[in-house]
């Protein structure tokens, strides 16, 4: 049985809550001192992992739509993508404010150059910014065929973001590896499309 438009609306509400409630918990945990000895790092990692989870969830929508034969599921993709951008922005802000500090924000440029994993992160964020700004129907109509070409860059983010995470951790743990494997599986599912996109 196919999902109805009303059921999709309730699903979207649930997804909004699933993406928002971790932010409530983050503020609570930070205010109550629930993080470990290095709360700045913990907050950065938490926001980064949330962005990655939502990135993978965004990429999962199309396979689920086709495998489950639920065409209306595609309506959830944009909200997941926008939440991914929101959490990626929180990740960038947490690094800028908690790692560098307001007085040292001028060092951000040199940090991006001297630390390649940060370069991958900022490139990913800039792509997500472009996708978020053009995610609305008005932008889609204005860009025409170029809209799809632009939004295919989400696949580049799916490559760069897991590498950014793997590269940033000092001690390799299963978590970043699992995110990378998830991205590989979702990209492999799109092998033909990726090959065509790469050739254009």
Curated annotation (Swiss-Prot):
GO molecular function, one term: oxidoreductase activity, acting on diphenols and related substances as donors
Pfam families: Ferric_reduct
Signal peptide residues on this chain, from the entry's feature table: none
Membrane topology of the entry: Multi-pass membrane protein
One Gene Ontology term from the biological process aspect of the record: protein repair
InterPro entries, A to Z: Fe3_Rdtase_TM_dom (IPR013130), MsrQ-like (IPR022837)
Keyword field: Cell inner membrane, Cell membrane, Electron transport, Flavoprotein, FMN, Heme, Iron, Membrane, Metal-binding, Transmembrane, Transmembrane helix, Transport
Essential cofactor(s): FMN; heme b
GO cellular component: plasma membrane
Cofactor: record remark: Binds 1 FMN per subunit.
Subcellular location: Cell inner membrane
Transmembrane segments: 8-28, 54-74, 79-99, 116-136, 153-173
The protein's assembly and partners: Heterodimer of a catalytic subunit (MsrP) and a heme-binding subunit (MsrQ).
Family: Belongs to the MsrQ family.
NCBIfam families per UniProt: PRK05419.1-2, PRK05419.1-4
Role summary: Part of the MsrPQ system that repairs oxidized periplasmic proteins containing methionine sulfoxide residues (Met-O), using respiratory chain electrons. Thus protects these proteins from oxidative-stress damage caused by reactive species of oxygen and chlorine generated by the host defense mechanisms. MsrPQ is essential for the maintenance of envelope integrity under bleach stress, rescuing a wide series of structurally unrelated periplasmic proteins from methionine oxidation.
Matches recorded under HAMAP family: MsrQ (MF_01207)
Protein name as catalogued: Protein-methionine-sulfoxide reductase heme-binding subunit MsrQ
Higher taxonomy: Bacteria, Pseudomonadati, Pseudomonadota, Gammaproteobacteria, Enterobacterales
């Amino acid at each position: 049985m196919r999902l109805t438009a009303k059921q999709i609306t309730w699903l979207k509400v649930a997804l909004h809550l699933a993406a928002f409630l971790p932010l409530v918990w983050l503020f609570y945990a930070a205010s109550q001192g629930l993080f470990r000895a290095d709360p700045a790092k913990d907050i950065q990692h938490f926001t980064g992992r949330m962005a990655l989870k939502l990135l993978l969830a965004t990429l999962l929508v199309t396979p689920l739509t086709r495998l489950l034969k639920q065409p209306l599921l595609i309506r959830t993709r944009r909200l997941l993508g926008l939440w991914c951008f929101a959490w990626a922005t929180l990740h960038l802000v947490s690094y800028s404010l908690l790692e560098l500090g307001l007085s040292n924000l001028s060092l951000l440029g040199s940090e991006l150059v001297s630390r390649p994993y940060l370069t991958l992160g900022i490139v990913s964020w800039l792509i997500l910014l472009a996708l978020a700004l053009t995610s609305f129907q008005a932008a889609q109509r204005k860009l025409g065929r170029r809209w799809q070409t632009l939004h295919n860059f989400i696949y580049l983010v799916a490559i760069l973001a897991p590498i950014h995470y793997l590269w940033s951790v000092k001690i390799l743990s299963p978590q970043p590896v699992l995110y990378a494997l998830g991205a590989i599986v979702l990209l492999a599912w799109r092998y033909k499309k990726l090959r065509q996109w790469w050739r254009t």
